[in-house]
Design a protein with these regions (language model features):
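C-terminal accessory segments enriched in acidic
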Residues: 3-6, 26-49, 187-188, 196-207, ...
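Sec-dependent N-terminal signal peptides of Gram-positive bacterial secreted proteins and lipoproteins
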Residues: 1-29
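Active-site/substrate-binding loop(s) of hydrolase catalytic cores
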Residues: 92, 106-110, 115-235
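Mid-chain, structured segments of secreted extracytoplasmic proteins
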Residues: 81-88, 93-101, 105-113
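Alpha-helical scaffolding within the catalytic cores
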Residues: 81, 150-160, 268-274
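Soluble metallo-hydrolase cores and metallopeptidase-like ectodomains found primarily
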Residues: 45-93
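Loop/turn elements at helix/coil->beta-strand transitions in domains of secreted/extracellular proteins
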Residues: 65-68, 77-79, 91-94, 129-134, ...
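Active-site-proximal beta-strand/loop segments in catalytic clefts of secreted hydrolases
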Residues: 72-74, 86, 98-101, 136-140, ...
Length: 351
């Protein structure tokens, strides 16, 4: 369904002058080997609320003829879960971008919203003719709004709300993926019933945040990536996932503010990266950006001074991915970099 209403709220994009994929100039020191912790205060008030995000999506839907806005289901607390769709030809390859399975990992959502705006600027002329794009921002809206059935009094962020990893029922949505669909939490259940079961998806990037102290080669990472590591996933699916990772790595690593490591992740089918690849044959990539928007452990949260580069990193990732899929250059990507990409470790917190 297409929804048409006026936007009623502020946009973080306009606040930060992030109108295009170029976003904002970021000093190289902001990421690689960047600040250890205390990188500015953690302010949730500058982030989109659920309500302002919905208004933003409706405004973009009104402006963009290529975009359709669909409600795929509801959260535990009854919030509609939105998906932005760009489908020009059912025969095109399709990519899904998923953000905020964990509610306290929001800057990837801010980047996804900027990318949606970017898709309506004309700077992707021709791209949308050759790839279908599905974007689900803020899957876990209850956790993002702190509207949960447990206490968040130990969380550290300042602002108008706290954000938590878990959904309203205190469940980690990224551990639901091995269950029967009917046994999943509502947010995961609707993702499966109304997206993964409905659309012929070829690629997916699952966007997350991690703590602030992950490093490789003595430098703090700006993000880490990983393909499906469950042994039951088809080898061709894994190889295509590695090619997807190659697109992301070769886009970000050469930039002065980018430093990418290999994520040290599990192989369980209950994790989205593995379970979705195993169940549907979708080539998936996990991207863990540096720092969270809120947490009860201080070293996990990254302050607002780092917001710009994390948003830019997300937009660059999504833009490069759709272009590589659209022109089929992803099929020629060299995956050998994975053989030498260091697996991240955690730097000791000196504070």
């Amino acid at each position: 369904m297409t929804l048409k209403k006026k936007i009623l709220s502020f946009s973080l994009s306009s606040m930060m002058a992030l109108g295009t994929v170029t976003v904002v100039a970021i000093p190289a020191s902001a990421v690689g080997n960047g600040p250890n912790a205390g990188n500015g205060s953690v302010q949730t008030s500058i982030l989109h609320t659920y309500e302002s995000m919905v208004s933003y999506l409706k405004e973009q839907d009104k402006k963009q003829s290529a975009m359709d806005l669909e409600v795929i289901g509801q959260t535990v607390k009854g919030r509609d879960i939105y998906m932005a769709k760009y489908i020009s030809n059912p025969d095109n390859p399709t990519v899904l971008f998923l953000t905020q399975q964990h509610g306290n990992e929001q800057l990837t959502t801010e980047g996804a919203l900027d990318f949606i705006k970017h898709l309506g600027t004309g700077k992707t002329k021709g791209v949308l003719d050759n790839v279908n794009i599905l974007i689900i921002p803020m899957l876990n809206a209850d956790g993002a709004m702190g509207d949960v059935n447990f206490s968040l009094e130990d969380y550290i962020a300042d602002g108008d709300r706290h954000l938590t990893r878990y959904n309203a029922n205190n469940v980690d949505l990224n551990r639901e993926h091995a269950k029967d669909i009917m046994d999943m939490e509502p947010e995961a259940k609707f993702l499966y019933e109304n997206v993964l079961e409905k659309y012929p998806i070829d690629y997916m990037i699952d966007l997350h945040h991690q703590g602030t102290l992950s490093e490789t080669n003595g430098e703090l990472v700006s993000g880490s990536i990983l393909y499906p590591t469950n042994s039951e996933v088809d080898a061709e699916v894994v190889e295509k996932s590695k090619k997807l990772g190659s697109v992301v790595y070769n886009t970000l690593e050469p930039k002065g503010w980018g430093h990418i490591g290999q994520y040290n992740g599990g192989s369980g089918a209950n994790i989205g990266r593995n379970g979705i690849a195993l169940r549907y044959g979708i080539s998936t990539l996990l991207f863990e950006m540096r720092g969270m928007s809120d947490h009860y452990i201080e070293s996990y949260a990254l302050g607002q001074k780092s917001n710009g580069y994390l948003i830019k990193q997300t937009v660059s990732t999504l833009d490069a991915t759709v272009r590589a899929i659209a022109d089929r250059s992803i099929e020629k990507e060299d995956t050998s970099f994975w053989d030498t990409l260091p697996t991240q470790t955690n730097r000791q917190n000196d504070e």
